[in-house]
Amino acid sequence: MDAIAARALSVVRACVTVTDARVSLDPGVMETLGIAINRYNGLTNHSVSMRPQTQAERNEMFFMCTDMVLAALNVQIGNVSPDYDQALATVGALATTEIPYNVQAMNDIVRITGQMQTFGPSKVQTGPYAGAVEVQQSGRYYVPQGRTRGGYINSNIAEVCMDAGAAGQVNALLAPRRGDAVMIYFVWRPLRIFCDPQGASLESAPGTFVTVDGVNVAAGDVVAWNTIAPVNVGNPGARRSILQFEVLWYTSLDRSLDTVPELAPTLTRCYAYVSPTWHALRAVIFQQMNMQPINPPIFPPTERNEIVAYLLVASLADVYAALRPDFRMNGVVAPVGQINRALVLAAYH
C-alpha cells in the first residue's frame, strides 16, 4: 500500500510542474510521467499528453491525477460528472513496479505509516479542562464543606480555595479531563485580592506554597508535571487564600496536528475553496471515505488512511490550481462573477 500511495503522490506532484511548455522538465519528472502516462493510457484508453496545452489536454491530465488518487485510496465515487468517468483500471498502472516514486513522496508516506503504528507525546491543541462540565467565577471564594475546594475557571485554568491553615493534594483537579496525558506544564500563583461569598474583598495570606513530589516550586515558575507525582498545596497563614493554576500546554499520546509533519497546512489546503467544481469533487471523495466533506474535522485525524487521503487530496488541489481544468459536477452551478469572500462563506455554510 505504501508503494502505491507513493507512486500516486509522485505522479500527481509531477503533473504540477508541466504546465509551462517553455520550461525544461526535471529528468525525474520526465521519467515518472513518461512511464505513468504510458501505462495509464494503455490500460484506460485515454490520451493524456505529457505537456498539456489545450483545455482538453489539461482536463485529461487532471482526470488522470484524480484516477490516481482514487485508486490509491481504493475509493469509487460513481457518476458525479457528465465529463468525467472514473477509470477503475488505474490501480493496475499504479501496481506496476516500473513507475518510479520520488524520495520525498515515499518518505512522506512511510512517515505517516510509521507514526500511526506507534504512539508518542505531542502537544494537544485543546485545553486540558475543555471536557469540564461546569466552571466557576475566578477570584470568588467558595468552600461549601471541608477546608479546601478546587474548580475550573476555563479550559486552561483551575483555582483552589483554602481556609486558614488548610492543606491538600490537587492531582485529580490538575489532571486533564480526557486523553492519556504525558506531561503537563503549568505555573501557579496566589490570587492577591479576591472576594468572599458575600462580596467583600480579601487578601490571600502570605506563605502559601505548592510542592511537586515534595519539592517546593516557586510561584510563576514553569513546572513540568508527569501527572503522577503528588502535587500538594498549603496555606499556613491565618487568612483564607486562593491559588490559581494555569496550564501553559500539555502533551498526550493522543494524535495531534504535530503527529505528522505539515499536517495542519495539508488540512488547510484540502479544505480551501478553489472553485465550486473543486469544492464539490473534494466533498464527494471525502464522503466516500466517511470523512468531513466541507469543513476540517474537529479533532486531528487518527487513522493512517485519513492522513494519506488528506495528503493526496491536497496534492490534487495543487494540480487543480496548476492545470485549471474545466468540467462540470452534477448539481453544481457555476457562480456569476468573480469568487469573493461572501460566496466562499456561503459555500461552507
Curated annotation (Swiss-Prot):
GO terms for molecular function: host cell surface receptor binding; structural molecule activity. Signal peptide: none annotated. It is found in: Virion. Keywords: Capsid protein, Glycoprotein, Outer capsid protein, Virion. SUPFAM superfamilies: A virus capsid protein alpha-helical domain, Viral protein domain. Belongs to the orbivirus VP7 family. This is Core protein VP7. It comes from African horse sickness virus 9. The lineage of its organism: Viruses, Riboviria, Orthornavirae, Duplornaviricota, Resentoviricetes. The gene is Segment-7.
